[in-house]
Amino acid sequence: MTTPSRTVPGFVNAHTHIYSALAPYGMPPASPPPENFVQILERVWWRLDRALDERSLRASARLYAAESLLYGTTTLIDHQESPAFIEGSLDVLADACQEFGIRAVLCYGATDRNGGREEGRRGLAECRRFIRGNQRPLVRGVVGLHASFTCSDETLHEAGEVARELDTVMHVHMAENRADVEDARKRGYEGPLERLLATDSLPAGSIMAHGVHLEPSQVRVAESRGLWLAQNPRSNEGNRVGYASSLWVSGKVALGTDGWEADMPKEFAALERLSAGSVHEEVDAAARRLVTGRVLAAERFAGAPGAAGPEGDQVIYAAGEDDQPAQVSRVTVAGQVVVDQGRLVHGDLEELRAKAREEAQKLWPRMAAL
């Protein structure tokens, strides 16, 4: 039986890491194999981000932006980390997104984990520089923090000051793993949410990724403060950090991929599967997360000059057989067609993948040497 073509609003990836797009191109396994989440960070992702340079980041950004559009994702809310290439890194991401016609909300995730307070200051300075100078109509900037357990109270407080100075919000990892909670308690706080609130680091409208280890009472506090949460079910399952079972109490929860490909229908399916055993989640929880992501994107682009808002972004699926996955045929962002007949309008996917393979082969030796 044939399914007719259909039109849906563009998808929003509410939390991702564009810099990870080269990982499928032969990233070597961690050695020795990690046994917990912090070891996954230390042996995989923190080594990868330290190995990034301008060329590898550009190849990653161009590929991720292009492939996202082919999945029907029209807005990326990204969290960048590249300690060896901080200054100018957000321009690399922004240029790639503007090139292919995808919306993006960008930040650099400031952290003290490698170079102490000076590293944190440089990350915040990159956010400030980018927000002040960005003129791209499809790109907005916010302030970023990695996760509170990698930051001093001074860096957290300074990040909040920068956000208020620039009249913007924060994008931060929140209670992804128990390590974040335990670190906050060792510092005298009830948890990472309370720590960030105490250091005045979360302006209303801020985006907190994960929230796996928040209690329902904490999620209610977050909602009352006007804070967004971005749930990342595939990543949380893959990293074995648990299911974010308390997020059901908030109406401000969107769906992200945490660096996985921006295939939001696949993320939707993962959330449906993982939430099936929850006594609290409503049957339409996954669908509501997708809708909420569009509300979040509209909030971040409200009043942006030079382009129509994300509310009009559209994806058209081609007609096809019921037993076959739906195929994206056409994608429109800000009134411009960026995918037509299933192909990029502004680039060649195979050329982008070839460049990604080339840069990946240079990246892995740098990563192994760290």
Residue map of PLM features:
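Histidine-centered catalytic micro-motifs
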Residues: P9-A21, V169-R178
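Histidine-rich, glycine-flanked metal-binding segment
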Residues: M1-V8, R132-N134
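Divalent metal-coordination and catalytic microenvironments
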Residues: H15, G72, C97, V143, ...
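Active-site microenvironment of metallo-dependent hydrolases
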Residues: L290-L370
